[in-house]
Protein backbone atom coordinates (compact mmCIF):
# COMPACT_ATOMS: atom_id res chain seq x y z
CA UNK A 1 0.00 0.00 0.00
CA UNK A 2 1.17 3.50 -0.80
CA UNK A 3 -0.43 6.13 1.37
CA UNK A 4 0.80 9.70 1.19
CA UNK A 5 -0.04 13.17 2.33
CA UNK A 6 1.69 16.49 1.80
CA UNK A 7 3.61 17.51 4.91
CA UNK A 8 1.41 20.60 5.36
CA UNK A 9 -2.35 20.58 4.89
CA UNK A 10 -4.25 23.78 5.57
CA UNK A 11 -7.65 23.29 7.12
CA UNK A 12 -10.06 25.44 5.73
CA UNK A 13 -7.80 10.49 -29.18
CA UNK A 14 -6.02 10.41 -29.73
CA UNK A 15 -2.57 10.94 -28.64
CA UNK A 16 0.75 9.38 -29.12
CA UNK A 17 2.08 6.72 -26.80
CA UNK A 18 0.83 7.18 -23.27
CA UNK A 19 -2.25 9.34 -23.06
CA UNK A 20 -5.62 8.23 -21.91
CA UNK A 21 -9.01 9.63 -22.79
CA UNK A 22 -12.10 8.61 -20.84
CA UNK A 23 -15.59 9.21 -22.15
CA UNK A 24 -18.70 9.26 -20.02
CA UNK A 25 -21.82 11.34 -19.95
CA UNK A 26 -24.33 12.69 -17.44
CA UNK A 27 -24.20 12.97 -13.66
CA UNK A 28 -20.57 12.82 -12.56
CA UNK A 29 -18.44 13.66 -15.57
CA UNK A 30 -20.70 14.50 -18.49
CA UNK A 31 -18.76 15.22 -21.65
CA UNK A 32 -21.63 15.56 -24.12
CA UNK A 33 -22.64 19.21 -24.10
CA UNK A 34 -23.01 22.39 -26.15
CA UNK A 35 -20.65 24.53 -24.04
CA UNK A 36 -17.12 23.83 -22.82
CA UNK A 37 -14.54 25.91 -20.93
CA UNK A 38 -10.85 25.02 -20.94
CA UNK A 39 -7.50 26.42 -19.79
CA UNK A 40 -4.77 25.01 -22.03
CA UNK A 41 -1.66 24.07 -20.03
CA UNK A 42 1.85 25.36 -20.66
CA UNK A 43 3.81 22.35 -21.92
CA UNK A 44 7.61 22.48 -21.88
CA UNK A 45 8.89 23.64 -25.26
CA UNK A 46 12.22 22.00 -24.42
CA UNK A 47 10.51 18.61 -24.64
CA UNK A 48 7.98 19.43 -27.36
CA UNK A 49 4.68 21.27 -27.03
CA UNK A 50 3.11 21.18 -30.50
CA UNK A 51 1.05 20.40 -32.56
CA UNK A 52 -1.96 21.14 -30.37
CA UNK A 53 -5.58 20.85 -31.40
CA UNK A 54 -9.21 20.07 -30.64
CA UNK A 55 -11.35 17.15 -31.83
CA UNK A 56 -15.14 17.06 -31.84
CA UNK A 57 -17.70 14.28 -32.25
CA UNK A 58 -21.35 15.03 -33.03
CA UNK A 59 -24.14 13.00 -31.45
CA UNK A 60 -26.40 12.17 -34.40
CA UNK A 61 -26.94 15.72 -35.69
CA UNK A 62 -24.52 17.92 -37.59
CA UNK A 63 -22.91 20.63 -35.44
CA UNK A 64 -21.39 24.05 -36.02
CA UNK A 65 -18.73 24.63 -33.38
CA UNK A 66 -17.29 28.03 -32.42
CA UNK A 67 -13.95 28.32 -30.58
CA UNK A 68 -13.23 31.67 -28.95
CA UNK A 69 -11.04 33.40 -26.38
CA UNK A 70 -13.58 35.66 -24.64
CA UNK A 71 -10.95 37.71 -22.79
CA UNK A 72 -8.81 38.25 -25.89
CA UNK A 73 -10.75 39.98 -28.71
CA UNK A 74 -7.55 40.11 -30.79
CA UNK A 75 -8.05 36.40 -31.59
CA UNK A 76 -10.95 35.94 -33.99
CA UNK A 77 -13.36 33.07 -33.25
CA UNK A 78 -12.77 29.88 -35.24
CA UNK A 79 -15.57 27.78 -36.75
CA UNK A 80 -15.59 24.02 -37.28
CA UNK A 81 -18.36 22.05 -39.00
CA UNK A 82 -18.93 18.53 -37.71
CA UNK A 83 -21.02 16.16 -39.87
CA UNK A 84 -23.87 14.16 -38.37
CA UNK A 85 -22.45 11.31 -36.25
CA UNK A 86 -19.03 12.42 -37.43
CA UNK A 87 -15.64 13.58 -36.17
CA UNK A 88 -13.85 16.84 -37.03
CA UNK A 89 -10.65 18.46 -35.77
CA UNK A 90 -8.79 21.77 -35.80
CA UNK A 91 -5.06 22.45 -35.42
CA UNK A 92 -4.48 25.30 -32.94
CA UNK A 93 -0.68 25.44 -33.16
CA UNK A 94 -0.74 28.85 -34.89
CA UNK A 95 -2.38 30.32 -31.77
CA UNK A 96 -0.25 28.47 -29.19
CA UNK A 97 1.19 31.64 -27.63
CA UNK A 98 -2.34 32.98 -27.16
CA UNK A 99 -3.61 29.69 -25.73
CA UNK A 100 -1.01 28.06 -23.47
CA UNK A 101 -1.05 29.47 -19.94
CA UNK A 102 2.36 31.01 -19.37
CA UNK A 103 3.74 32.66 -17.29
CA UNK A 104 2.51 31.29 -13.96
CA UNK A 105 1.30 33.47 -11.08
CA UNK A 106 -0.12 36.00 -13.56
CA UNK A 107 -3.66 36.87 -14.64
CA UNK A 108 -3.87 36.00 -18.35
CA UNK A 109 -6.48 36.29 -21.13
CA UNK A 110 -6.09 32.75 -22.48
CA UNK A 111 -9.28 30.91 -21.52
CA UNK A 112 -10.94 28.89 -24.31
CA UNK A 113 -14.71 28.71 -24.74
CA UNK A 114 -16.28 26.20 -27.14
CA UNK A 115 -19.94 26.48 -28.12
CA UNK A 116 -21.86 24.15 -30.40
CA UNK A 117 -25.23 24.27 -32.17
CA UNK A 118 -25.96 20.66 -31.11
CA UNK A 119 -24.51 18.36 -28.41
CA UNK A 120 -20.94 17.17 -29.03
CA UNK A 121 -18.03 15.57 -27.21
CA UNK A 122 -14.72 17.43 -27.30
CA UNK A 123 -11.11 16.89 -26.36
CA UNK A 124 -7.90 18.89 -26.49
CA UNK A 125 -4.69 17.15 -27.46
CA UNK A 126 -0.95 17.74 -27.49
CA UNK A 127 0.21 15.64 -30.43
CA UNK A 128 4.00 15.87 -30.25
CA UNK A 129 5.62 12.44 -30.60
CA UNK A 130 7.70 12.47 -27.43
CA UNK A 131 5.41 14.35 -25.01
CA UNK A 132 1.73 13.89 -25.84
CA UNK A 133 -1.52 13.78 -23.91
CA UNK A 134 -5.25 14.25 -24.34
CA UNK A 135 -7.67 16.21 -22.19
CA UNK A 136 -11.32 15.12 -22.20
CA UNK A 137 -13.46 18.26 -21.89
CA UNK A 138 -16.33 17.75 -19.49
CA UNK A 139 -18.75 20.54 -20.37
CA UNK A 140 -20.97 21.82 -17.59
CA UNK A 141 -19.74 19.07 -15.26
CA UNK A 142 -16.24 20.57 -15.28
CA UNK A 143 -17.66 23.72 -13.70
CA UNK A 144 -17.86 24.22 -9.98
CA UNK A 145 -16.88 26.32 -6.99
CA UNK A 146 -14.88 23.85 -4.88
CA UNK A 147 -11.94 21.71 -6.03
CA UNK A 148 -9.09 19.74 -4.48
CA UNK A 149 -6.05 18.92 -6.61
CA UNK A 150 -5.25 15.19 -7.02
CA UNK A 151 -2.02 13.84 -8.47
CA UNK A 152 0.95 11.49 -8.23
CA UNK A 153 4.16 11.60 -6.21
CA UNK A 154 6.08 8.61 -7.61
CA UNK A 155 7.61 10.23 -10.74
CA UNK A 156 9.74 13.38 -10.86
CA UNK A 157 9.70 15.84 -13.78
CA UNK A 158 12.36 15.83 -16.47
CA UNK A 159 10.97 19.00 -18.05
CA UNK A 160 8.18 21.29 -16.94
CA UNK A 161 6.37 21.09 -13.60
CA UNK A 162 3.23 19.93 -11.84
CA UNK A 163 0.63 22.69 -12.32
CA UNK A 164 -3.06 23.52 -12.40
CA UNK A 165 -4.68 26.20 -14.55
CA UNK A 166 -7.92 28.01 -13.66
CA UNK A 167 -10.38 29.67 -16.07
CA UNK A 168 -13.30 31.89 -15.00
CA UNK A 169 -16.66 31.63 -16.75
CA UNK A 170 -18.12 34.89 -15.36
CA UNK A 171 -16.86 38.41 -14.65
CA UNK A 172 -15.67 39.36 -11.16
CA UNK A 173 -15.02 35.79 -10.01
CA UNK A 174 -13.24 35.72 -6.65
CA UNK A 175 -11.01 32.65 -6.22
CA UNK A 176 -9.16 31.51 -3.09
CA UNK A 177 -6.22 29.12 -3.48
CA UNK A 178 -4.37 27.22 -0.72
CA UNK A 179 -1.32 25.47 -2.24
CA UNK A 180 0.36 22.51 -0.54
CA UNK A 181 3.74 23.25 -2.13
CA UNK A 182 5.68 26.41 -2.94
CA UNK A 183 4.53 27.92 -6.23
CA UNK A 184 6.49 29.75 -8.89
CA UNK A 185 6.29 33.40 -7.92
CA UNK A 186 6.89 32.68 -4.23
CA UNK A 187 3.42 31.68 -3.01
CA UNK A 188 3.98 29.57 0.11
CA UNK A 189 2.36 26.26 1.13
CA UNK A 190 -0.59 26.58 3.47
CA UNK A 191 -0.95 30.32 2.93
CA UNK A 192 -4.28 31.24 1.26
CA UNK A 193 -4.28 33.89 -1.45
CA UNK A 194 -7.10 35.39 -3.48
CA UNK A 195 -7.36 36.46 -7.12
CA UNK A 196 -10.22 38.02 -9.10
CA UNK A 197 -10.77 36.91 -12.71
CA UNK A 198 -13.15 38.11 -15.38
CA UNK A 199 -14.84 35.86 -17.94
CA UNK A 200 -12.22 34.01 -19.99
CA UNK A 201 -9.29 35.08 -17.83
CA UNK A 202 -6.94 32.43 -16.47
CA UNK A 203 -4.38 31.89 -13.72
CA UNK A 204 -1.70 29.18 -13.54
CA UNK A 205 -0.44 27.70 -10.25
CA UNK A 206 2.86 25.97 -10.97
CA UNK A 207 5.10 24.07 -8.57
CA UNK A 208 8.56 25.54 -8.00
CA UNK A 209 10.45 22.24 -8.33
CA UNK A 210 10.76 18.96 -10.22
CA UNK A 211 11.23 16.39 -7.44
CA UNK A 212 8.64 13.78 -6.46
CA UNK A 213 7.88 15.85 -3.36
CA UNK A 214 7.34 19.05 -5.39
CA UNK A 215 3.70 18.23 -6.10
CA UNK A 216 0.48 20.13 -5.52
CA UNK A 217 -1.58 17.18 -4.22
CA UNK A 218 -4.27 18.31 -1.80
CA UNK A 219 -4.22 21.99 -2.80
CA UNK A 220 -7.61 23.68 -2.38
CA UNK A 221 -9.39 26.01 -4.82
CA UNK A 222 -12.72 27.68 -4.01
CA UNK A 223 -14.65 30.40 -5.84
CA UNK A 224 -17.87 32.38 -5.66
CA UNK A 225 -18.77 31.67 -9.32
CA UNK A 226 -18.20 28.62 -11.57
CA UNK A 227 -14.66 27.93 -12.74
CA UNK A 228 -12.89 25.08 -14.57
CA UNK A 229 -9.45 23.66 -13.76
CA UNK A 230 -6.89 21.82 -15.89
CA UNK A 231 -4.32 19.59 -14.15
CA UNK A 232 -0.92 18.64 -15.61
CA UNK A 233 2.30 16.96 -14.52
CA UNK A 234 4.72 17.66 -17.36
CA UNK A 235 7.36 15.24 -18.70
CA UNK A 236 7.30 12.83 -15.76
CA UNK A 237 10.06 10.23 -15.65
CA UNK A 238 8.01 7.14 -16.45
CA UNK A 239 11.17 5.29 -17.45
CA UNK A 240 12.34 5.44 -13.84
CA UNK A 241 9.58 2.95 -12.97
CA UNK A 242 8.60 1.26 -16.23
CA UNK A 243 12.09 0.56 -17.67
CA UNK A 244 13.25 3.01 -20.32
CA UNK A 245 14.04 6.62 -21.06
CA UNK A 246 10.46 7.86 -21.25
CA UNK A 247 9.42 11.36 -20.15
CA UNK A 248 5.71 12.07 -20.67
CA UNK A 249 3.02 14.66 -20.08
CA UNK A 250 0.18 13.72 -17.72
CA UNK A 251 -2.97 15.81 -17.83
CA UNK A 252 -6.75 16.03 -17.65
CA UNK A 253 -9.57 18.45 -16.92
CA UNK A 254 -10.77 18.13 -13.33
CA UNK A 255 -14.29 17.80 -12.00
CA UNK A 256 -15.38 19.75 -8.91
CA UNK A 257 -15.94 18.13 -5.53
CA UNK A 258 -19.72 18.30 -5.91
CA UNK A 259 -19.50 16.00 -8.97
CA UNK A 260 -17.41 13.25 -7.33
CA UNK A 261 -18.68 9.70 -6.86
CA UNK A 262 -17.99 6.68 -4.66
CA UNK A 263 -17.86 3.65 -7.02
CA UNK A 264 -15.21 3.13 -9.70
CA UNK A 265 -14.02 0.43 -12.09
CA UNK A 266 -10.49 0.74 -13.49
CA UNK A 267 -8.89 -1.48 -16.13
CA UNK A 268 -5.15 -1.93 -16.42
CA UNK A 269 -3.77 -0.42 -19.61
CA UNK A 270 -0.61 -1.37 -21.48
CA UNK A 271 2.34 -0.19 -19.39
CA UNK A 272 5.30 -2.56 -18.96
CA UNK A 273 4.38 -3.86 -15.51
CA UNK A 274 5.50 -6.62 -13.16
CA UNK A 275 3.40 -9.69 -12.41
CA UNK A 276 3.44 -8.94 -8.68
CA UNK A 277 1.02 -6.24 -7.51
CA UNK A 278 3.37 -5.31 -4.65
CA UNK A 279 6.17 -4.47 -7.11
CA UNK A 280 6.93 -0.81 -7.83
CA UNK A 281 6.60 -1.43 -11.60
CA UNK A 282 2.82 -1.48 -11.71
CA UNK A 283 0.09 0.75 -13.03
CA UNK A 284 -1.38 2.94 -10.30
CA UNK A 285 -4.91 3.86 -9.35
CA UNK A 286 -4.70 6.80 -6.96
CA UNK A 287 -7.62 7.53 -4.64
CA UNK A 288 -7.59 10.97 -2.98
CA UNK A 289 -9.99 11.81 -0.17
CA UNK A 290 -11.68 15.19 0.05
CA UNK A 291 -13.22 14.50 3.47
CA UNK A 292 -11.72 13.08 6.67
CA UNK A 293 -12.65 9.50 7.49
CA UNK A 294 -12.91 8.28 3.89
CA UNK A 295 -12.69 4.48 3.78
CA UNK A 296 -11.49 2.62 0.67
CA UNK A 297 -12.83 -0.84 -0.24
CA UNK A 298 -11.50 -3.10 -3.02
CA UNK A 299 -13.16 -5.68 -5.28
CA UNK A 300 -16.35 -6.15 -3.28
CA UNK A 301 -14.71 -6.63 0.13
CA UNK A 302 -16.60 -5.31 3.16
CA UNK A 303 -13.30 -4.58 4.94
CA UNK A 304 -11.62 -1.25 4.21
CA UNK A 305 -7.97 -1.36 3.12
CA UNK A 306 -7.38 2.12 4.54
CA UNK A 307 -9.04 5.21 5.97
CA UNK A 308 -7.93 8.55 4.54
CA UNK A 309 -8.03 12.13 5.74
CA UNK A 310 -8.75 14.94 3.29
CA UNK A 311 -5.79 15.36 0.94
CA UNK A 312 -4.36 11.90 1.62
CA UNK A 313 -3.95 9.37 -1.19
CA UNK A 314 -4.09 5.59 -1.47
CA UNK A 315 -2.32 3.82 -4.35
CA UNK A 316 -3.84 0.62 -5.75
CA UNK A 317 -1.10 -1.16 -7.72
CA UNK A 318 -2.08 -3.12 -10.83
CA UNK A 319 0.40 -5.71 -12.10
CA UNK A 320 -0.13 -8.23 -14.87
CA UNK A 321 -2.21 -10.41 -12.55
CA UNK A 322 -4.74 -7.63 -11.86
CA UNK A 323 -6.47 -6.66 -15.13
CA UNK A 324 -9.33 -4.78 -13.45
CA UNK A 325 -10.24 -3.44 -10.01
CA UNK A 326 -13.52 -2.32 -8.46
CA UNK A 327 -13.09 0.47 -5.92
CA UNK A 328 -15.69 1.80 -3.50
CA UNK A 329 -15.24 4.71 -1.10
CA UNK A 330 -17.39 5.66 1.89
CA UNK A 331 -17.36 9.33 0.86
CA UNK A 332 -16.90 11.04 -2.52
CA UNK A 333 -13.29 10.94 -3.74
CA UNK A 334 -11.05 11.71 -6.69
CA UNK A 335 -9.67 8.67 -8.53
CA UNK A 336 -6.79 8.95 -11.04
CA UNK A 337 -5.30 6.20 -13.21
CA UNK A 338 -1.67 6.16 -14.38
CA UNK A 339 -1.51 4.00 -17.50
CA UNK A 340 -0.11 4.00 -21.05
CA UNK A 341 2.07 1.84 -23.31
CA UNK A 342 5.50 0.41 -22.43
CA UNK A 343 7.10 3.14 -20.31
CA UNK A 344 5.11 5.96 -21.97
CA UNK A 345 2.70 7.20 -19.32
CA UNK A 346 -0.59 9.07 -19.32
CA UNK A 347 -3.31 9.59 -16.77
CA UNK A 348 -7.01 10.32 -16.52
CA UNK A 349 -9.62 11.31 -13.97
CA UNK A 350 -11.75 8.18 -13.60
CA UNK A 351 -15.53 8.68 -13.79
CA UNK A 352 -17.65 7.03 -11.14
CA UNK A 353 -19.78 4.19 -12.48
CA UNK A 354 -22.84 5.91 -11.03
CA UNK A 355 -22.32 8.08 -14.11
CA UNK A 356 -24.54 6.42 -16.69
CA UNK A 357 -21.99 6.48 -19.52
CA UNK A 358 -22.66 7.10 -23.20
CA UNK A 359 -24.39 5.12 -25.94
CA UNK A 360 -22.21 6.66 -28.69
CA UNK A 361 -18.58 7.85 -28.65
CA UNK A 362 -16.38 9.09 -31.49
CA UNK A 363 -12.59 8.92 -31.65
CA UNK A 364 -9.66 9.10 -34.07
CA UNK A 365 -6.25 7.43 -34.13
CA UNK A 366 -3.59 10.15 -34.48
CA UNK A 367 -0.63 7.99 -35.53
CA UNK A 368 0.20 4.39 -36.38
CA UNK A 369 1.85 3.86 -32.98
CA UNK A 370 0.32 1.28 -30.63
CA UNK A 371 -3.39 1.79 -30.09
CA UNK A 372 -5.88 0.37 -27.65
CA UNK A 373 -9.14 1.00 -25.90
CA UNK A 374 -10.98 -0.29 -22.85
CA UNK A 375 -14.74 -0.67 -22.42
CA UNK A 376 -16.88 -1.02 -19.30
CA UNK A 377 -20.61 -1.69 -19.50
CA UNK A 378 -23.45 -3.44 -17.74
CA UNK A 379 -23.87 -7.13 -18.50
CA UNK A 380 -27.05 -6.68 -20.57
CA UNK A 381 -25.18 -4.52 -23.12
CA UNK A 382 -22.16 -6.64 -24.00
CA UNK A 383 -23.54 -8.06 -27.27
CA UNK A 384 -24.96 -4.81 -28.65
CA UNK A 385 -21.91 -2.88 -29.90
CA UNK A 386 -21.45 -1.39 -33.37
CA UNK A 387 -18.45 0.32 -34.95
CA UNK A 388 -19.34 2.85 -37.64
CA UNK A 389 -22.78 1.25 -37.93
CA UNK A 390 -21.57 -2.35 -38.27
CA UNK A 391 -21.98 -5.00 -35.57
CA UNK A 392 -18.77 -5.17 -33.54
CA UNK A 393 -17.99 -8.17 -31.35
CA UNK A 394 -15.89 -7.59 -28.24
CA UNK A 395 -14.81 -10.26 -25.74
CA UNK A 396 -16.01 -9.26 -22.26
CA UNK A 397 -15.21 -10.55 -18.75
CA UNK A 398 -17.17 -9.97 -15.53
CA UNK A 399 -15.71 -7.41 -13.10
CA UNK A 400 -14.96 -9.18 -9.79
CA UNK A 401 -16.87 -7.84 -6.80
CA UNK A 402 -19.81 -6.41 -8.79
CA UNK A 403 -22.13 -9.47 -8.59
CA UNK A 404 -21.85 -9.93 -12.36
CA UNK A 405 -23.49 -6.54 -12.93
CA UNK A 406 -20.53 -5.04 -14.82
CA UNK A 407 -18.26 -6.39 -17.56
CA UNK A 408 -15.00 -5.11 -19.03
CA UNK A 409 -13.05 -5.60 -22.25
CA UNK A 410 -9.91 -4.29 -23.92
CA UNK A 411 -8.87 -4.09 -27.54
CA UNK A 412 -5.23 -3.60 -28.59
CA UNK A 413 -3.59 -3.08 -31.98
CA UNK A 414 0.17 -3.13 -32.53
CA UNK A 415 2.16 -0.29 -34.02
CA UNK A 416 1.61 -0.07 -37.80
CA UNK A 417 -1.40 -2.40 -37.59
CA UNK A 418 -3.88 -0.04 -39.23
CA UNK A 419 -6.15 -2.57 -40.94
CA UNK A 420 -9.03 -1.91 -38.55
CA UNK A 421 -8.14 1.52 -37.11
CA UNK A 422 -6.26 3.85 -39.45
CA UNK A 423 -5.13 7.44 -38.96
CA UNK A 424 -7.41 9.07 -41.53
CA UNK A 425 -10.85 7.81 -40.45
CA UNK A 426 -13.15 8.91 -37.65
CA UNK A 427 -14.72 6.06 -35.67
CA UNK A 428 -18.04 5.87 -33.82
CA UNK A 429 -18.47 3.13 -31.20
CA UNK A 430 -22.11 2.76 -30.19
CA UNK A 431 -24.38 0.47 -28.21
CA UNK A 432 -28.02 -0.13 -29.09
CA UNK A 433 -29.22 -1.35 -25.67
CA UNK A 434 -27.37 0.72 -23.09
CA UNK A 435 -24.50 2.98 -22.13
CA UNK A 436 -20.80 2.31 -21.66
CA UNK A 437 -17.52 3.90 -20.56
CA UNK A 438 -14.71 4.06 -23.13
CA UNK A 439 -11.01 4.67 -22.48
CA UNK A 440 -8.67 5.40 -25.41
CA UNK A 441 -4.91 4.81 -25.09
CA UNK A 442 -2.83 5.72 -28.19
Question: What residues fall within each predicted segment?
Answer:
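Bacterial N-terminal signal peptides
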Residues: 11-24
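Extracellular lectin-like interaction modules
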Residues: 31-442
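Sec/Tat signal peptide C-region and signal peptidase I cleavage site
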Residues: 25-30
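N-terminal secretory signal peptides that target proteins for export/translocation
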Residues: 1-10
Amino acid sequence: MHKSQKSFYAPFLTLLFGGMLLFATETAVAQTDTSFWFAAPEVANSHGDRPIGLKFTSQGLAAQVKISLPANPAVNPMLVNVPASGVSSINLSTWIDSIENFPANTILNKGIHISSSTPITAYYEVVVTNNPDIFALKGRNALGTSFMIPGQDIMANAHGRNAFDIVATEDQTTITIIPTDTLEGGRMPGVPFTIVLNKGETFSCRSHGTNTYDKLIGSRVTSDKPIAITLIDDSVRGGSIYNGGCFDLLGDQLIPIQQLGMEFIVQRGFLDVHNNNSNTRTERVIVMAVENGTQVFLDGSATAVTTLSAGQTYHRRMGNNLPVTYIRTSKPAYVMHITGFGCETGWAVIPAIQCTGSSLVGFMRSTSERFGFTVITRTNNINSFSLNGNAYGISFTAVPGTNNEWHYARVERAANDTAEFNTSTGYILSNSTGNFHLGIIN
